From Swiss-Prot:
<keyword id="KW-0539">Nucleus</keyword>
<dbReference type="InterPro" id="IPR015418">
    <property type="entry name" value="Eaf6"/>
</dbReference>
<keyword id="KW-0234">DNA repair</keyword>
<feature type="coiled-coil region">
    <location>
        <begin position="18"/>
        <end position="44"/>
    </location>
</feature>
<dbReference type="GO" id="GO:0005634">
    <property type="term" value="C:nucleus"/>
</dbReference>
<comment type="similarity">
    <text>Belongs to the EAF6 family.</text>
</comment>
<dbReference type="GO" id="GO:0006281">
    <property type="term" value="P:DNA repair"/>
</dbReference>
<comment type="subunit">
    <text>Component of the NuA4 histone acetyltransferase complex. Component of the mst2 complex composed of at least eaf6, mst2, nto1, pdp3, ptf1, ptf2 and tfg3.</text>
</comment>
<keyword id="KW-0805">Transcription regulation</keyword>
<dbReference type="GO" id="GO:0140861">
    <property type="term" value="P:DNA repair-dependent chromatin remodeling"/>
</dbReference>
<comment type="function">
    <text>Component of the NuA4 histone acetyltransferase complex which is involved in transcriptional activation of selected genes principally by acetylation of nucleosomal histone H4 and H2A. The NuA4 complex is also involved in DNA repair. Component of the mst2 complex which is a highly specific H3 lysine 14 (H3K14) acetyltransferase that functions together with gcn5 to regulate global levels of H3K14 acetylation (H3K14ac), critical for DNA damage checkpoint activation.</text>
</comment>
<keyword id="KW-0175">Coiled coil</keyword>
<dbReference type="GO" id="GO:0005829">
    <property type="term" value="C:cytosol"/>
</dbReference>
<keyword id="KW-0227">DNA damage</keyword>
<dbReference type="Pfam" id="PF09340">
    <property type="entry name" value="NuA4"/>
</dbReference>
<keyword id="KW-0156">Chromatin regulator</keyword>
<feature type="compositionally biased region" description="Basic residues">
    <location>
        <begin position="129"/>
        <end position="138"/>
    </location>
</feature>
């Protein structure tokens, strides 16, 4: 039976309960660290494999830039390699937890769509209160 000052859902406060909770917390922290390590390894693997794919297919075509180069199929396209930018890394840079998305080179890359949007917004804000209309508003 509960007393007027306590709620029925409160567990009894004692040392064994505290030790049990402390043990569970340490187990969860260890599990989280293992999962984070595994995630970093997977993201790094995706980054390397994606770079290899983009490098091998830059002359002929790939899923990022299209396959027009495959239709042309001349010798210069087949010899050309590594013609891609960091913003072409659609898969590895889509993860917010990837260490590659937090790199300064990615943040300062002006070729990304986000950077272009940011520039346009800053430019439109500097036009003395003039508002730029879009096709959706018409």
């Amino acid at each position: 039976m509960s007393t007027p000052n306590s709620t029925p859902s409160e567990p009894p406060v004692n040392v064994s309960y505290y030790e049990q909770c402390k043990k569970e917390l340490h187990e969860m922290i260890e599990k989280r660290q293992l999962l984070e390590t595994s995630l970093i390894g997977l993201e790094d693997s995706i980054y390397r494999l994606e770079g290899s794919y983009l490098e091998k297919t830059s002359g002929t075509g790939n899923i990022i830039r299209g396959f027009e180069g495959l239709l042309k199929n001349n010798a210069s396209n087949l010899r050309r390699r590594a013609d891609y930018s960091e913003s072409d890394r659609l898969f590895s840079l889509s993860s917010l937890s990837s260490p590659h998305t937090r790199s300064p080179a990615y943040d300062l890359d002006d070729s990304t769509e986000t950077s272009r949007r940011r520039k346009r917004k800053n430019e439109s804000d500097s036009h003395e209160g003039r508002r730029r209309s879009s096709f959706r508003e018409l």
